[in-house]
């Protein structure tokens, strides 16, 4: 099956689109040289940009003034008279300016090479330049790099100038040298002084011209290739010791001998004038490896170890001095026997001591109460005053009664309700019925009073009369429908019966009445 050309092109397009979508987003390249210097920022703040922009605008769009107005037109015909001194000064200044201009051309400021940091996605650049490898021989030295003119002048000056002086020694060196001279013999001290004077004379004389060195000899003198390494000081050997008492070890211990920090003068001069080795190869063969100092083996007997110089490896902990033990023989303390009977030899009962302490407390002496006589009491009774508490209470009660009307304030007057005609008619009928009932009651009461007047009043008769009055008042004042008499027909009822077709509107007695101020719900429940 061969694919069509159109299908292949379509598939290629799809693959290209997928590759573009799946690629990471392109990061914008940063500028190679960012202007982060504070000088440039200060220039912008000072307003140099504003000045430059205004100058450029005026130069491009401003009106061009003629040269004659400013006074810059040249006049070749004009001549000036100048003194001879001024003319020479002017010529001298011109010559100096020309020399400065020429020197600036020769000594231009070489800018430092800026190492450009490659971008994140950039590939490493490999310089495909051939590297020339020279076969180094022992006799021929490699060619030296070309020096600048300034560096060559400095070299010539150094050869002709006086040799460099040795660094001054510290004050401590002189003190140590004096101490060594006192200890040593007089002969040795005189020899040392002669050697020192000879060395100083040699240094003062001019050094000989440097001989031609081969490449291997120069490597010998190089500080980087050291032929012999100093033997590293191995740690002091540890020796096991017997278990010594703390006080004895302090007495036997010798004071720590501090090694002298400064070396003797002879050793220093010996190192300075030490003979050189026979070439680079011999020095390499004779060089020793920088071997590490091997640790000392762990001793079998565990215990306290000290150094050869008397110094211990670990700081010994000071043990407190323990006093010698005393042989204390404890004796059994025998307690005195107590008689259970609680009686002594005489047969008297012995009281315990704590009771005696309680009894010894101080008690106040008894005071005899004085009995007053009758005439004295009568005389003092006259001076007595009545109790005033009751009077105060009465006065307070009067004040409270006076304050009652102020506290019990009356509410606002209730507005009178307007009475309609049908209600007024109803009230009249009810009043008539009440008057008829009261008349009947009065008649009954009159009959009873006559009987009561005839008969003597007794307690039973009084009770009966009171009960009758209560019954009559209940019949009159009762609001039950059964006790009330039948209501008489009013004019309104007669009109409604005559006109059956007219629709009677519902009468709401509470709707038309004028209400007072609206009731507020209680806030504090």
From Swiss-Prot:
Tell me, what is an example of a GO biological process annotation in this record? endocytosis
The annotated regions of Basic residues compositional bias extend over 510-525
Coiled coil ranges (UniProt) are: none
**Polar residues biased stretches:** 148-162, 251-261, 382-398
Biased composition of type Basic and acidic residues is found at: 110-122, 171-182, 201-223, 230-242, 314-325, 339-354
Q: Does Membrane count among this protein's keywords?
A: yes
Q: Where in the cell is it found?
A: Cell membrane; Cytoplasm, Cytoskeleton, Actin patch
Identify the taxonomic lineage of the organism of origin: Eukaryota, Fungi, Dikarya, Ascomycota, Saccharomycotina
Q: What is this protein called?
A: Protein BSP1
GO cellular component terms? actin cortical patch; plasma membrane
Compositional bias, Acidic residues, is annotated for 447-456
Keywords for this entry?
Cell membrane, Cytoplasm, Cytoskeleton, Endocytosis, Membrane
Q: Where is the composition biased (Low complexity)?
A: 285-297
Purpose: Cortical patch protein involved in endocytosis.
Residues passing through the membrane, by range: none
Cytoplasm keyword on record: yes
Q: Where is this region: Disordered?
A: 21-40, 98-262, 285-325, 339-525
Q: How does it sit in the membrane?
A: Peripheral membrane protein
| Superkingdom of this protein's organism | Eukaryota
């Amino acid at each position: 099956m061969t694919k069509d050309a159109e299908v292949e092109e379509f598939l290629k397009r799809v693959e290209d689109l997928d590759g573009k979508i799946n690629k990471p987003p392109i990061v914008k390249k940063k500028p190679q040289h960012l202007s982060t210097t504070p000088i440039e920022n200060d220039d912008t703040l000072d307003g140099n940009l504003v000045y430059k922009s205004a100058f450029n605008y005026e130069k491009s769009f401003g009106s061009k003034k003629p040269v004659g107005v400013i006074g810059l037109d040249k006049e070749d015909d004009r001549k000036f008279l100048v003194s001879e001194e001024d003319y020479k000064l002017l010529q001298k200044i011109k010559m100096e300016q020309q020399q400065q201009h020429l020197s600036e051309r020769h000594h231009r400021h070489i800018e430092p090479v800026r190492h450009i940091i490659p971008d994140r996605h950039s590939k490493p650049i490999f310089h495909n330049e051939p590297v020339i490898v020279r076969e180094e021989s022992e006799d021929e030295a490699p060619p030296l790099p070309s020096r600048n003119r300034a560096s060559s002048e400095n070299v010539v000056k150094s050869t002709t100038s006086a040799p460099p002086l040795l660094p001054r020694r510290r004050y401590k060196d002189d003190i140590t040298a004096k101490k060594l001279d006192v200890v040593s013999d007089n002969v040795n001290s005189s020899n040392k002084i002669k050697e020192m004077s000879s060395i100083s004379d040699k240094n003062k004389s001019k050094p000989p011209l440097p001989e031609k060195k081969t490449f291997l000899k120069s490597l010998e003198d190089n500080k980087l290739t050291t032929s012999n390494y100093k033997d590293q000081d191995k740690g002091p050997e540890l020796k096991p010791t017997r278990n010594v008492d703390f006080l004895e070890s302090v007495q036997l211990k010798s004071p720590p001998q501090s090694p002298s920090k400064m070396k003797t003068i002879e050793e220093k001069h010996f190192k300075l004038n030490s003979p050189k080795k026979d070439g680079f190869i011999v020095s390499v063969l004779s060089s020793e490896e920088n071997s590490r100092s091997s640790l000392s083996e762990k001793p079998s007997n565990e215990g306290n170890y000290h150094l050869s110089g008397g110094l211990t490896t670990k700081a010994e902990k000071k043990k407190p001095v323990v006093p010698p033990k005393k042989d204390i023989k404890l004796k059994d303390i025998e307690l005195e026997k107590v008689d259970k009977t609680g009686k002594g030899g005489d047969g008297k009962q012995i009281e315990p001591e704590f009771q005696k302490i309680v009894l010894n407390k101080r008690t106040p002496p008894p005071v005899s109460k004085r009995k007053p006589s009758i005439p004295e009491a009568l005389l003092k009774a006259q001076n007595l005053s009545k109790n005033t508490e009751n009077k105060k209470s009465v006065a307070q009660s009067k004040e409270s009664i006076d304050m009652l009307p102020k506290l019990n304030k009356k509410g606002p007057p209730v507005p009178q309700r307007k009475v309609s005609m049908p209600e007024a008619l109803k009230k009249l009928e009810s009043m008539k019925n009440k008057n008829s009932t009261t008349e009947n009651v009065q008649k009954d009461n009159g009959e009873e009073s006559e009987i009561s007047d005839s008969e003597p009043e007794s307690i039973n008769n009084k009770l009966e009369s009171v009960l009758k009055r209560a019954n009559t008042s209940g019949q009159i004042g009762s609001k039950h429908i059964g006790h009330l008499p039948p209501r008489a027909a009013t004019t309104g009822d007669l009109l409604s019966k005559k006109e059956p077709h007219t629709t009677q509107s519902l009468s709401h007695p509470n709707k038309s009445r004028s209400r007072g101020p609206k009731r507020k719900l209680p806030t504090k429940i």
